[in-house]
Design a protein with these regions (language model features):
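"Short basic amphipathic alpha-helical interaction patches in structured regions
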Residues: 107-112
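Charge-rich, low-complexity segments
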Residues: 1-92, 98-102, 113-346, 356-366, ...
């Protein structure tokens, strides 16, 4: 890119900020590198505090332990949920996505870049593991355990499950405070099957005020039942990285008005991050705002399809997209970008991605696109209230 375009690009990215602070000056990829070095310097003290908790020197989940862990993680993540533990051999840092697949992507990136010096003493885990013993929650003077919950499963064609759950101890909560009852059950489900399987395979669940007809099973046996039905071993069930490479196809009704706006012409697409696409379509920005705080952005490269006129036009358009993805990935590197799918529209084709180093990715893409035989190409983030920038 020319010097003036570099300035224009940086000014464009600065305009994303609503607080006056440009988070992209310190991109996520750099935060991760520096963050792991900070973790290395402080991890011995964190291990000591975990051991103190195990030995009863400090209370379970004490403010002291939480503060020590946040001090090591906040240089990377402004908002992070985690658990710590010890499995008899190594200390464990468990990073949780709070039921949101979009949050898995930066957590997996962080996990993959853990230095070997950290991994000698720590297991860095993304997503809560199943609690195979009879986990229980004590609320309002009574214990509610997985053994108290019965479940009926209805499997769908896409290998996701709809659950119907009955717990006698929760019936009164269900009548008095339904949201609270569902919150408790979310916790129990995560402990029963693990966070990744819960996000990936449980489409929805319903709490019942009385048992359902037919044979049910205790919640303690749900994980094994899901494994058997899906034909997966434990590691496959809990593999968050593999889940982030799983794609979902979707169809939309396109707007034929060429002036309707970015992405309004899309009629079909595929994505590995459904929540991101859904939020954009619903004019929401929670995920994008959260990404921005950590020096991440997500968006699309779009290019005009008017120049593709051969008989195999559709294949040409998609082949061009695949080639563009490969060239950008080779030039920018996996450290800078993760591609998450794409979409086809009446007037444009779209290549979707998450950028861990946004400025580098856009500069690389502009350099590659300038030599392509297409009439128009631009970048647009998955914010409805932000403009795109022309790259060709």
């Amino acid at each position: 890119m020319s010097k003036i375009n570099e300035k224009k690009l940086k000014k464009y990215i600065e305009d994303w900020s609503q607080s006056g602070k440009n988070e992209m000056e310190y991109p996520f990829c750099e935060r991760v590198k520096e963050g792991w070095q900070i973790f290395l310097k402080g991890e011995s003290l964190l291990r000591q505090k975990i051991d103190d908790m195990r030995n009863g020197v400090i209370k379970q989940n004490s403010d002291e332990l939480v503060a020590a862990c946040l001090e090591l993680l906040n240089p990377v993540f402004q908002d992070i949920c985690f658990e710590t533990g010890y499995n008899g051999e190594k200390h464990e840092l468990i990073l949780t996505a709070e039921g949101d697949k979009a949050k898995l992507f930066p957590l997996i990136y962080f996990q993959k870049h853990a230095p070997k010096e950290v991994l000698e003493r720590w297991n860095i885990i993304v997503g809560r593991r199943p609690f195979h013993e009879a986990y229980s929650i004590r609320m309002f003077g009574q214990n509610i355990s997985m053994k108290d919950v019965w479940v009926w499963i209805e499997w769908k064609e896409n290998k996701t499950a709809e659950l119907f759950l009955y717990c006698e101890k929760l019936v009164s909560f269900l009548q008095e405070n339904e949201n609270y009852a569902y919150w408790l059950m979310c916790i129990l489900l995560d402990q029963a099957v693990g966070e990744i399987p819960s996000i990936r395979y449980i489409d929805r669940f319903e709490l019942l005020e009385q048992p359902k007809d037919g044979d049910g099973l205790p919640l303690t046996k749900l994980f094994n039942c899901m494994q058997k039905t899906l034909g997966l071993d434990t590691e496959e069930m809990l593999d968050g990285a593999k889940y982030c490479e799983t794609y979902t196809a979707y169809e939309l009704k396109p707007d034929e008005n060429i002036k309707a706006g970015w992405r309004k012409d899309v009629f079909v697409g595929i994505t590995s991050c459904v929540p991101l696409i859904s939020e954009y379509l619903q004019n929401e920005s929670r995920i994008m705002d959260s990404f921005y705080q950590d020096g991440i952005t997500a968006g699309s490269f779009s290019y005009s399809v008017e120049g593709f006129t051969e008989e195999n036009r559709g294949k040409q358009i998609l082949d061009f997209r695949d080639q563009l993805e490969a060239e950008i990935l080779e030039a920018a590197g996996e450290e800078a970008v993760t591609f998450i799918g794409g979409a086809s529209g009446i007037y444009c084709c779209y290549l979707d991605f998450i950028a861990w180093n946004p400025i580098k990715v856009l500069e690389v893409a502009a350099e590659i696109l300038k030599n392509k035989k297409i009439a128009l190409a631009e970048f647009h983030p998955f914010w409805n209230d932000k403009k795109g920038i022309r790259l060709k």
